[in-house]
Amino acid sequence: MSIRLQEAGLRHGQVQALNNVDLQIGKGERVAIIGPSGAGKSSLLHLMATAVRPSAGQLDLLGEQPWLLTSGARQRLRARVGLVHQAPPLPPRQRVVTAVLAGRLGQWGTLRGLLNLIHPSDVPGAREVLAELGMVDKLFVQCGQLSGGQLQRVGIARALYQQPEVLLTDEPVSAMDPVLADHSLALLNRHAQAHGVTLVASLHAVELALAHFPRIIGIRAGEVAFDCPAEAVTPTMLDALYANEQLGSPVVPTATVLVQIPRC
């Protein structure tokens, strides 16, 4: 089992971002998380990545309980997990080649990591992953000169170069045009299938989620609304998931009730 959440909750100050989440994601599974803005998709991914600690419940990641480990052991565990941000945090003056190679900083010693900032240690490796994303011509360009969609492709290239066992992607194609978005998600899925990588992506574009991922998890108001194979997701389920999103209506807290989460 790659990821297991048991009654997991997460609070941001007074806001309950996630509540009573139970999920199991096996090795090599490819899963899309969908839901309205503010539903908790990013919070769920960051919880899985150990970027934040659950305020309730338990996370098991790659057979470990991260928050029971020493800080050093937790860092080594994180090196086995890739995280692609919606807006990759890349310094504007950093060259693309350095940004991509930084994917393995958690696996390298301190000296090699520092030397890589001065003289990139694996230019062919960076070039190979960038070529798959149509970005090889940007190898030595500074990140500050790239568009939002290009920066997202650099973030994906960085994660692919890292070669993680679990790859978590948070709205990885939101700034790309439809053709590039489709190509990038297809590439991520091919890579995951070829290498047995567990792939989890949060996506706002439902059509991309259904087209590329065998399993779909719907999140609404910080809770799992449904967990089904893509072919079992119905328009009725989607209507309920996204109800009132276009109106920007706040979620009204309701009394806790016991529900059966559909898992098809």
UniProtKB/Swiss-Prot annotation:
Disulfide bonds: none annotated. Its main location: membrane. It is an enzyme of class 7 (translocase). Keywords: ATP-binding, Cell inner membrane, Cell membrane, Membrane, Nucleotide-binding, Phosphonate transport, Translocase, Transport. It is a peripheral membrane protein. The keyword Amino-acid biosynthesis does not apply. InterPro entries: AAA+_ATPase, ABC_transporter-like_ATP-bd, ABC_transporter-like_CS, MetN_ABC_transporter-like, P-loop_NTPase. The complex is composed of two ATP-binding proteins (PhnC), two transmembrane proteins (PhnE) and a solute-binding protein (PhnD). Part of the ABC transporter complex PhnCDE involved in phosphonates import. Responsible for energy coupling to the transport system. This is Phosphonates import ATP-binding protein PhnC. It comes from Pseudomonas entomophila (strain L48). The gene is phnC.
